C-alpha cells in the first residue's frame, strides 16, 4: 500500500468535517463528488447555494451529502463577525469592518474552523497562498511551540531509490521567502515531525545548500550551517545534517566522497531548502522532469489544519489534500 492509499484508508476510519472555501469552483465540485463517494470526509462547501447546485447538476455530480454555507445568508455570519471583532479589536478592527470581512469565503471558512464547526480547511484553487495565510494567521495562529507556518510537498517519484523508495518531503516550498537560521531550524523540526506523524517514516533531514560541509563560504552557507546547529541544540534526537548539496544528501556514493562522516548524507528523506526560490523551483523541477506526484503544498505549524492548493491543481490533487487534512485533524498535526 502506497502513502496515498494509506492516507485514504486512515481518513475513512475516522471521518472529519472539512470546509472547502471555494465551493463554487469546478475542480472543487468534482473533488467533492469523489470525496463523498469514497467516504473520505464530511464536507462543507462555501458559496452561493443555487450556483453550487446548478454547477453540480451541469457536471452531473452528486454533492447532496455536502453541507452548503453561504456567508451572505448563514445564521453563523453574525456570530463570526462578533467573534472576529473581539479577536482583532486590539489591532483597530471595527464591528462594521468585521461584518464585511467575514463575508469573504476564506475568512468565513477560517472562522468556522476557529469555532470548531469544522475540523480542517482547504483553499487555494482560486486564491493565492497569501490570501489563505492571512486569515489563518490572524484567526487560528500557530500551534504551541511553533514559531512560523511553513509549507511542504510530499514528493512521490516513480522508479526512484532515493529517500524512502522515492518518497521525500520538500520544505519550505510555499510560504517563507527568505527564512532566517532560526526559522529554517523551525521548518526542519516541524517537517521532521510531519514526516513521522503523517508519512510514518523516520525523518533524516538534510539542510540543503550549494556547499557541502564547508566546501564554500559566505553568508548563505553560514545561514544553513547555523540552522543545523540551532536544530541540534533544541532537538538533539533528530537525525539532521548540513550544509549538504543535493547529490550528497540523497546519493550514498556521492555522500561517501563529500560527507563520509555524516549520519544523514546519502539517505535523506526530508529536504529543507534555504529559501522559497530554491524550494519552489526544486519541487517543480522534480514534478515535471521526473514525472513525480507532488502532493501539496501542505501547511504545517497552524494550531488547526489549514491547507493550500496550487492554482494549477487538479480535482485529484484536491481529493488528496482533503484526505491529508483529515489525517492531520485526526493526529493533531
From Swiss-Prot:
It catalyses: acetyl-CoA + phosphate = acetyl phosphate + CoA. InterPro entries: P_Ac_Bu_trans (IPR012147), P_AcTrfase (IPR004614), P_AcTrfase_dom1 (IPR042113), P_AcTrfase_dom2 (IPR042112), Phos_Acetyltrans/Butyryltrans (IPR050500), PTA_PTB (IPR002505). GO terms for biological process: acetate biosynthetic process; acetyl-CoA biosynthetic process. One of its GO terms (molecular function) is phosphate acetyltransferase activity. The keyword Cytoplasm applies. GO terms for cellular component: cytoplasm. It is an enzyme of class 2 (transferase). Its EC number is 2.3.1.8. Its main location: cytoplasm. Keywords: Acyltransferase, Cytoplasm, Transferase. It comes from the Bacteria. It holds the Pfam family PTA_PTB. It is found in: Cytoplasm. Pathway: Metabolic intermediate biosynthesis; acetyl-CoA biosynthesis; acetyl-CoA from acetate: step 2/2. Belongs to the phosphate acetyltransferase and butyryltransferase family. PANTHER family: PHOSPHATE ACETYLTRANSFERASE. This is Phosphate acetyltransferase.
Amino acid at each position: 500500500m502506497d502513502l496515498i492509499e494509506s492516507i485514504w484508508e486512515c481518513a475513512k476510519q475516522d471521518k472529519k468535517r472539512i470546509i472547502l472555501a471555494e465551493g463554487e469552483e469546478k475542480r472543487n465540485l468534482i473533488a467533492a463528488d469523489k470525496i463523498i463517494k469514497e467516504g473520505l470526509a464530511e464536507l462543507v462547501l462555501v458559496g452561493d447555494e443555487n450556483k453550487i447546485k446548478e454547477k453540480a447538476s451541469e457536471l452531473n455530480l452528486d454533492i447532496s451529502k455536502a453541507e452548503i454555507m453561504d456567508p451572505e445568508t448563514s445564521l453563523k455570519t453574525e456570530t463570526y463577525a462578533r467573534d472576529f471583532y473581539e479577536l482583532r479589536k486590539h489591532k483597530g478592527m471595527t464591528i462594521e469592518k468585521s461584518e464585511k470581512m467575514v463575508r469573504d469565503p476564506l475568512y468565513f471558512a477560517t472562522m468556522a474552523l476557529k469555532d470548531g464547526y469544522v475540523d480542517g480547511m482547504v483553499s487555494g484553487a482560486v486564491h493565492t497562498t497569501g490570501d489563505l495565510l492571512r486569515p489563518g494567521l490572524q484567526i487560528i495562529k500557530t500551534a504551541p511551540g511553533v514559531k512560523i507556518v511553513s509549507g511542504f510537498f510530499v514528493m512521490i517519484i516513480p522508479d526512484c531509490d532515493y529517500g524512502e523508495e522515492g518518497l521525500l518531503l520538500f520544505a519550505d516550498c510555499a510560504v517563507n521567502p527568505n527564512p532566517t537560521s532560526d526559522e529554517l531550524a523551525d521548518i526542519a523540526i516541524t517537517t521532521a515531525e510531519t514526516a513521522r506523524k503523517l508519512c510514518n517514516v523516520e525523518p533524516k533531514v538534510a539542510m540543503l545548500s550549494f556547499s557541502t560541509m564547508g566546501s564554500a563560504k559566505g553568508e548563505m552557507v553560514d545561514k544553513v550551517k547555523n540552522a543545523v546547529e540551532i536544530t541540534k541544540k533544541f532537538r538533539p534526537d533528530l537525525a539532521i545534517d548540513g550544509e549538504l548539496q543535493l547529490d550528497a544528501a540523497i546519493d550514498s556514493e556521492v555522500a561517501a566522497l563529500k560527507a563520509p562522516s555524516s549520519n544523514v548524507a546519502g539517505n535523506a528523506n526530508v529536504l529543507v531548502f534555504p529559501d522559497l526560490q530554491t524550494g519552489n523551483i526544486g519541487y517543480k523541477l522534480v514534478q515535471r522532469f521526473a514525472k513525480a506526484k507532488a502532493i501539496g503544498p501542505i501547511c504545517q505549524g497552524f494550531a488547526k489544519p489549514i491547507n493550500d492548493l496550487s492554482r494549477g491543481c487538479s480535482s485529484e490533487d484536491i481529493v488528496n489534500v482533503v484526505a491529508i487534512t483529515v489525517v492531520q485533524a485526526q493526529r493533531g498535526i
